[in-house]
Regions:
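Hydrophobic structural segments
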Residues: 1-134
Length: 134
């Protein structure tokens, strides 16, 4: 007896990834949220074009921030590192839920157990909006 395989489409989303180098912490946060908003638009549009059976969307590396270019650890943490339960993850979770997709990407992230440091974290958000892999 053969097991039925479920088929799905995956999208490797390519988009302009703005850098936040040279921006203030506040302007960096605003830039990151605008980028997430654009991602929502592109995911929705891509699903309309390539099919509703798109179930996995993979975002580019450094999609929200670029990478540090001379900033100190403290400066980059303030500018680029997001909170585990912060606005950026909430917005990404909404995209996954609204489009019924697994959303995969990476981000610089703060961890309360390691104050003053940031981590480059890969994540997967499920269609229910839950971060299922970090």
């Amino acid at each position: 007896m053969t097991k039925e395989t479920q088929h799905y489409m995956a999208l490797s989303l390519q988009l302009n990834c703005p850098t936040i180098n040279g921006l203030s912490a506040e302007d960096s946060r605003n830039s990151m949220m605008r980028t997430i908003e654009k991602i929502g638009f592109h995911v929705n549009g891509s699903k309309a074009l390539i099919g509703r059976d798109t179930k996995l969307v993979v975002l580019p590396e450094y999609f929200m921030t670029g990478y540090p270019l001379g900033e100190s650890i403290q400066e980059w943490t303030e500018k680029a590192a997001i909170e585990i339960d912060g606005a950026e993850y909430n917005a990404l979770s909404s995209i996954a839920q609204e489009n019924d997709v697994f959303l995969s990407g990476n981000a610089y992230e703060k961890d309360e157990h390691f104050p003053g440091l940031y981590f480059q974290t890969s994540f997967i958000i499920s269609p229910s909006g839950e971060v299922i892999l970090r």
